[in-house]
Each structure stands twice: as C-alpha cells, then as structure tokens.
Amino acid sequence: MRRIGIAALAAAALTYGANAQAQKKYGPQGVSDTEIKIGQTMPHSGPVSVYGIMGRVHMAYFQMVNERGGVNGRKVTLISADDAFSPPKTVEQTRKLVENDGVFMMFGSSSTAGQSAVQKYLNAKKVPQLMLSTGASKFNDPKNFPFTTPILQLYSTEGEVYAQYLMDTKPDAKVAILMQNDDFGRD
C-alpha cells in the first residue's frame, strides 16, 4: 500500500511538474509559476465613484487569498484601473491592462456601457471577461461572446420579478419607470 502511495505521489509530482514547465513556455498571458495577474476597471473617480469600493473589496479578498497561499501556490495580483465611469476611459484602461500589463483575465469590472465598449475586443483577444458587475442581457450570450460572464441576475428577470410582485400585492398600483439613457437604461 505504501509503494502505491509513493508511486501515486511521484506520478502526480511528475505530471504537475511537467505542466508547470509547459506553462512557462506555453501558458496563457498573465499566468506564471508564481503569479496570476488579473485586471479590472472600476469607477474610482467620477460621478459614481462610490462603486469603486467594489474594487477595493476585491483587492482585500485577493490579499486574503494570497496570505493563505494563493491559488495553487500562485500569488493573485489584481490591477484595478480607474475608468471614471466613462466608456472611452474603460476602453483605454482595458487595452492598457491587456496589452501593457499582460493580465490573464478581466474580473469584476463594472459599468454596462463601459463593458459593452470592450466586450468584442476582449472576446476577440480571448481574454476572459468574468463576473461583470452588470445584469445586462447582452453579457449573457455564450454563443457569440464565450469569454464574457456577468455575476448579477439579468435586469429583465429582475423587472419580471418586481412586476409580478406588484401584480400580486398591489394590482391597482400606478407604476412609473425612470431610466438613464444608455445601455444600462435601455436593457
């Protein structure tokens, strides 16, 4: 039994060792034997800078992950770039993160309009655009955008739930809808 355990451990070490060597040479951008580099765009300044707190929470989370040994022994480095809630700035910062900083993926970025502006670019580059802080239906399209995944429920689903609640509990209620005139509001 002990020989089988030692043989299994040796086989696993050789397998993972070979994978680590291959990764040095052939691995994806932003991933090395010691680090996983990820990026995000957040409104750390501008009209909705209060949402920048999400980026700081993500930084704290990955700091905790790193203090506990990282991911498979790799340190996670999150670069949180300020897009000031401006789609042109989102495009600029995303390109910098991918092309200059060499991030493996984009994680937890916010702004429906900003993420709409970079969705095609990131999918064309095959850079994962994961856990987007938006519920716009355009980000739930794996056939056309396989590298994009939102974290929030779809806004249309949320609207249906609210409408059903009103119909069930206040059937005579008058409803007003306010929207902002951009991708977020139109969805």
Can you name each region flagged by the protein language model?
Residues Y61-V71, L166:
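Flexible, small-residue-rich helix->loop connector segments that border functional cores
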Residues E35-K37, G73-L78, K174:
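Residues at or immediately flanking beta-strands
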Residues Y26-M59, A81-P88, S110-S111, L178-R186:
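Extracytoplasmic "Venus flytrap"
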Residues P88, G102-D187:
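Extracytoplasmic ligand/sensor domains, especially the bilobed periplasmic-binding protein
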Residues Q40, Y61, Q93, G135, ...:
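Hydrophobic alpha-helical segments typical of transmembrane helices
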Residues D33-E35, I53, G73, F85, ...:
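Extracytoplasmic
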Residues M1-I36:
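Short, low-complexity disordered leader/linker segments with a strong preference
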Residues K75-N100, E158-V161:
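Structural motif
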